[in-house]
Design a protein with these regions (language model features):
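Terminal amphipathic alpha-helical/low-complexity segments used for targeting or macromolecular assembly
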Residues: 1-44, 96, 102-115, 127, ...
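Flexible, glycine/small-residue-enriched loop-and-beta-strand segment within the central core
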Residues: 49-67, 71-143, 168-169, 176-177
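Glycine-centered loop/turn positions within well-structured domains
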Residues: 84, 153, 161-163, 171
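A generic "structured core" feature
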Residues: 129, 148, 153-154
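Short helix N-cap motif at coil->helix boundaries in the Bergerat
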Residues: 157
Length: 177
């Protein structure tokens, strides 16, 4: 049953994630659909085309909470295997992937869908900015308030409040003043 629900959820996202619903007025329809899909969905959010919130491998859907004034650019993929909180004024730039699970491999044989390890969830705190092409890996549970992640970064650990990181793996560059 979960697989059927996830398939329906993905089809709805594909339909309402097309460029047609980026037109003024029609993008409000997309926001109404998202209000039904998530635990909470704030006001004045902009979610661009080709954004996919998905639950892989038939896992149970987690709680997704999205604050106010959130901007998610096109072609962003968010794995919803664990709870996700996107706080107010968060910007997620295009081509970003947020992963919330990994596969455990023990021995020579394994089944991808049965060896899933989920994380404790991810919180993107207020006013953080995730640069284009960023990959956030499952062990990350927090991107701090006001943090900036440079474009093309691979985030492998938590980021402090107002910290600026970039690179592969993402390394400390400095702090916002």
């Amino acid at each position: 049953m979960e697989l059927v629900k996830e398939t329906i959820r993905r089809v709805i996202q594909i339909i309402f994630g097309t460029f047609i619903f980026d037109c003024p007025g029609l993008n409000k329809i997309r926001n109404v659909i998202y209000r039904f899909m998530f635990m909470s969905y704030g006001k004045k959010n902009i979610v661009s085309k080709k954004v996919m919130f998905y639950v892989p491998h038939g896992a149970k859907k987690a709680k997704i909470n999205i604050g106010d004034l959130v901007r998610i650019s096109e072609d962003v993929t968010i794995d919803c295997t664990s709870d996700i909180t996107i706080s107010d004024n968060v910007w997620i730039s295009e081509h970003t992937h947020i992963m919330n699970h990994e596969h455990i491999i023990c021995g020579k044989e394994w089944k991808k869908s049965k060896n899933i390890k989920t994380t404790s969830g991810l919180e993107l705190q207020e006013d953080c900015w995730i640069g284009a092409g960023t990959l956030i890996l499952p062990q990350v549970t927090q991107i701090g308030k006001g943090a900036i992640v440079g474009a093309g970064s691979v985030v492998t650990k938590n980021i402090d409040d107002y910290e600026i990181v970039a690179g592969n793996p993402a390394r400390h560059i400095g702090y916002r003043e």
